[in-house]
């Protein structure tokens, strides 16, 4: 069926509205789970210097994440303006953090990039490279921190210290294998479900790891600042890495409850009080999740309203 066929246009409109409705429903469900009175109290009473420093790092983190899609722009060779790429990346990341990868990482990317004129095959490559970049940095940092034994696990936890070290070594081996393939593989093209992917150069792979690692470290620094710098920074970073993979396994939007459970289990007691941890994580959620999500929602509506004009401009430039 041709894309200009009336039935296709009708189906596209229906799918678009279903997507909008799904996003609104998820936002409402998420908002109901948040104790907004407690959130406001924590922010109002927080140390201003720590709060402002954390805000600055949040901006830095979102800008760094935008570089994932700029790397993908170079990788795919598409000609969308860099500012458009950064805007789409910001919107997708904010929705991804709060409403899951399916909504933010995949659904929103396909919606916005297609509205701006990119074909589905290119969008698939952008998403694939972006998610690969994100997890390469995670794997590298987690491999180093877990192998070094920075994270002290409590007795009778889900895994012991030895298992975590073995996991760390395994993660570093994944990094080594990826770099080897990027540097020496003779067959650099592969097709997955009809999508052609090209293995990047080893220099490009290093850029992926560097940018993503810095972003994860900035995220760790935000929580460390909000904890009042009372705990070793690398320990906080290690706990964040543990909680992130736990959040992926449990698959709860925004990792509600998972982040708090892991941090209180690994930090509470001799390191810092449970109340301080919960307050810091609440502040972190407000700064890194809630406020960017509200801004992303506004940006999304503005981008949707300008999409036709931008698409025409992009197609003329291409």
Language model features by range: what are they?
Residues 103-115, 144, 253-268, 282:
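Re-entrant/interfacial helical elements at transmembrane boundaries that shape
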